[in-house]
Design a protein with these regions (language model features):
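Transmembrane helix-bundle signature of multi-pass membrane transporters/permeases
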Residues: 132, 144-149, 199, 234, ...
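Hydrophobic, membrane-embedded alpha-helices of multi-pass small-molecule transporters
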Residues: 1-10, 28-33, 37, 71-79, ...
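Membrane-interface alpha-helices at helix entry/exit sites of multi-pass transporters
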Residues: 29, 134-150, 224-232
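Inter-helical loop and helix-membrane interface segments of multi-pass membrane transporters/permeases
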Residues: 1-30, 79-104, 169-187, 218-221, ...
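Extracellular/periplasmic helix-exit of transmembrane alpha-helices
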Residues: 65-83, 91, 95-98, 130-132, ...
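Hydrophobic core segments of alpha-helical transmembrane domains in multi-pass membrane transport
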Residues: 1-4, 30-41, 59-70, 157-166, ...
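Membrane-interface loop-to-helix entry segments
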Residues: 12-17, 24-32, 36-85, 218, ...
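C-terminal structural cap/anchor segments
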Residues: 159-213
């Protein structure tokens, strides 16, 4: 939770607000850490409730806006798809061992960013799914699969295409700044402001969700007595994420993700027979 859960999320908020509103990352870090502390330590759930209510609507509006950008630049879509595959698999500029290294880096960053998007294989979303009030675990698991599809295949693909067809990937902007510039190009300053605010809500709600993940794990491993210390560390690292260098924050997050994924994937492998048996039983009963 100290990487993907708070530092990268806070860094995205800081980058978005700095790009759209010229707000200093340090100021953003103080405010985000304060709001996070009010919810995590102070139990002020109204802030979390507002984010929870706004995020679904913003997600719909954001997706519609990105789709509108694709429609405005629909003549560039074939070139966009071509550029994606050429940059991913072309080895024109390198050869031999260097070509293999380039391919390895492309796959490595693709997998790393995909994991950041959907948390697949980390075992984190299971904490929330297991707390749901459902009679059939298979049904809940299928919803988890759909979440990955909707988030990565739909929203992330639309975002990437919107950035490419609008040309903002060549502007020198980083991170959230590319999406903001894409929306500003299509809808003016209001579009950029909307994306900045939407990213802030998306990321802040993710921070709160990951704080819950971490609290449950600390409570399970060490008991309630250390939860307070974890909460303070989590809030502090959230502020650090806002002022940290983008590449450093992402590298730390990728490392932490790997440390979570390895033991979880091993456990999934050993439990796969049980999962297959439960799934086959569920399909047999509902078909």
């Amino acid at each position: 939770s100290f990487g993907i859960g708070n530092m990268t999320q806070a860094n995205s908020i800081a980058g978005a607000l700095e790009s759209a509103l010229r707000i200093a990352p340090l100021s953003t870090g103080i405010v985000v850490a304060l709001l996070c502390g009010l919810v995590v330590l102070g139990g002020i759930k109204r802030i979390a409730s507002v984010a929870e209510r706004c995020v679904p609507l913003m997600a719909v509006v954001y997706t519609a806006g990105a789709a509108a950008i694709l429609w405005l630049h629909r003549d560039r879509l074939p070139d966009a798809f071509s550029a994606i595959f050429q940059e991913a698999f072309s080895l024109r500029a390198v050869g031999g061992g260097a070509g293999g290294y380039a391919m390895m880096r492309a796959v490595r960053y693709g997998v790393a960013r995909g994991i950041f998007s959907n948390e697949a294989g980390l075992g984190s979303s299971v904490i929330v799914n297991s707390a749901s009030n459902v009679k059939e675990p298979v049904r809940q698991g299928m919803w988890g699969i759909f979440e990955v599809f909707a988030d990565t295949i739909v929203m992330c693909t639309i975002t990437a295409l919107a950035i490419i067809v609008s040309g903002t990937h060549l502007s020198g902007a980083e991170g959230a700044g590319m999406s903001i510039e894409a929306f500003e190009g299509a809808f003016g300053r209001a579009g950029g402001l909307f994306v900045a605010i939407a990213i802030a809500f998306f990321a802040f709600s993710s921070i709160l969700g990951w704080s819950y993940y971490g609290e449950r794990v600390v409570e399970y491993l060490f008991g309630r007595k250390l939860v307070g210390i974890y909460q303070l560390l989590f809030i502090g690292m959230t502020a650090v994420g806002c002022v940290g260098h983008l590449e450093l924050v992402w590298s730390l997050s990728d490392t932490f993700n790997g440390l979570m994924a390895i033991p979880n994937l091993i456990a999934v492998l050993f439990l796969s027979n049980q999962v297959f048996a439960i799934t086959r039983d569920y399909v047999r009963r509902v078909s």
